[in-house]
């Protein structure tokens, strides 16, 4: 039997319709959204009676989820939006001609790659809606994007250098995101 699934996104009370999630503690949201099913069991969220698994299962790059939320919650035009999106790695993928012939074994790598292709697609959609200069995606590439989730030693040896390199390469583009102080978000149910 396949369990019923329902996509759910925790939301702050930045819109008057969002009445419940803001009560959930930040650690619980983080735990729910990082419950990678091959590493951790789902997170049982008692108030809702739901069990959450990693958001990356359906939105490995949530840039479009956020963009749709902003456009639906506020009276705002796309030209007022700038997006900074930081990824966790997107290794290069090439489908070998033999794999294209089919079969479960041949397509195993393609299935894994499909998760990364959706990441590229989400970024491309956001750039299409906003304009290419309004959405900056910083993503580790090559070998830096292929660290297994439980490989702490490799992450410790690779990620600091990778972050320094990506920061240096994107420094000028990043500066605009920190040039002025953002206004506080709207709060409809919680205290300011």
Stretches found by the model and what they are:
Residues 1-192:
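Conserved catalytic cores and adjacent C-terminal regulatory segments
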């Amino acid at each position: 039997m396949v369990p019923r699934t329902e996509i759910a996104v925790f939301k702050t009370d930045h819109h008057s319709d969002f009445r419940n999630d803001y009560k959930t503690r930040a650690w619980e949201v983080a735990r729910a959204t990082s419950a990678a099913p091959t590493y951790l069991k789902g997170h049982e969220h008692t108030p809702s009676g739901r069990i959450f698994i990693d958001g990356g299962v359906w939105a490995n790059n949530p840039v479009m989820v956020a963009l749709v939320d902003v456009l639906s919650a506020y009276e705002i035009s796309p030209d007022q939006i700038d997006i900074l999106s930081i990824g966790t790695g997107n290794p290069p993928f090439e489908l070998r001609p033999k794999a294209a012939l089919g079969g479960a074994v041949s397509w195993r790598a393609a299935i894994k790659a499909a998760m990364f292709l959706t990441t590229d697609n989400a970024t491309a959609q956001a750039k299409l809606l906003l304009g290419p200069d309004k959405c900056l995606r910083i993503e580790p590439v090559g070998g830096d994007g292929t660290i297994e989730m439980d490989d702490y030693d490799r992450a410790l040896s690779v990620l600091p250098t990778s972050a320094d390199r990506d920061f240096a390469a994107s420094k000028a583009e990043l500066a605009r995101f920190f040039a002025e102080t953002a206004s506080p978000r709207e709060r409809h149910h919680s205290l300011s």
